[in-house]
Amino acid sequence: MSDFTEQTLRQKLANLSNHSNSIQTTSSWLLKNHNNREIIIRVWLKTVRKENKGAKVVNLLYVANDVAQNARKACPQFKDDFFPAIESAFRHCCELKAKEVENAIGKLIHVWKERQIYSQSQCKRLQEAHQQMKLSGSFPSPAGRNNGKNSQPNQFIVEEAKKNAQDVLVSLKRLQNPPSTERDIRIQLSKYPDNISCPEKLQSVQNSEEAKALLTQNEEALPMLEDYVKRLKEETKERESLETNLNMLIQNVRMSIEHHEKLCRDVKRKEDRIKADLLEVEKTFESLPDLTAEMPNAPLPTLEALFQKRK
């Protein structure tokens, strides 16, 4: 196994194939380097977003699946940290409109739900993304703008955007007074001597009394510090969730805008055609003889004159 570098990671993801050996080998390498999971997840998601071939995206999703399933014992945190990226990748797949990707996502959700890889609520969120992918065909895509078919408004996207907006508002409300801005606890923690947080400075302890005093201070600071760190982690997760919800909201709003812009273009085109037809009708109407006008008071031709005209 080679040492971990971001370039090596990119190369391995680029060389993925649909063979199980390729998927498993790459997955094992990722699990071995789980300490670099933040880089792995970031590069994996970026690779998925840049890929426009359905088969390549499926391979990347299968690698994530193998990592998530095998990380339960090796590194559970890897599996949990991977979820926001997986959800974001599922949302991105809506733009591909590839049947093979849609089928692969459906299978993965079923497996994760059945084997309890992810929780019921997490699987539900993934199912919503999958459903959004199924229904995204109702919206115009860059490749199909001129297909001449009128797509119908998708109520699901509207509801999804509303839900995203509500989630964003909830996250923003929770982050109004985050732990990272709590000045009092920072001041309180800073009052403790450096000895309790820096093992190198323990050499300055001269006797048992100083050691006991230091231990007492350590016991006082530890619960406070653990609680603060816990709340900071929760804040970090909340910020990650906010970022995910914002990305989802932007995507849904863009899809909705694209749909309504096409709808406006279609209506304008029909309006122009109706106006042109109306002008043509008016022009034809004006050229018709006026049947209400008085007929000229001229004598009718005689039978003899009619027969002469026929000859």
UniProtKB/Swiss-Prot annotation:
GO terms for molecular function: RNA polymerase II complex binding. Keywords: Coiled coil. It comes from the Eukaryota. Disulfide bonds: none annotated. Residues 224-256 form a coiled coil. Residues 1-134 form the CID domain. InterPro entries: CID_dom, ENTH_VHS, RPRD1A/B_C. One of its GO terms (biological process) is mRNA 3'-end processing. This is CID domain-containing protein 1. It comes from Caenorhabditis briggsae.
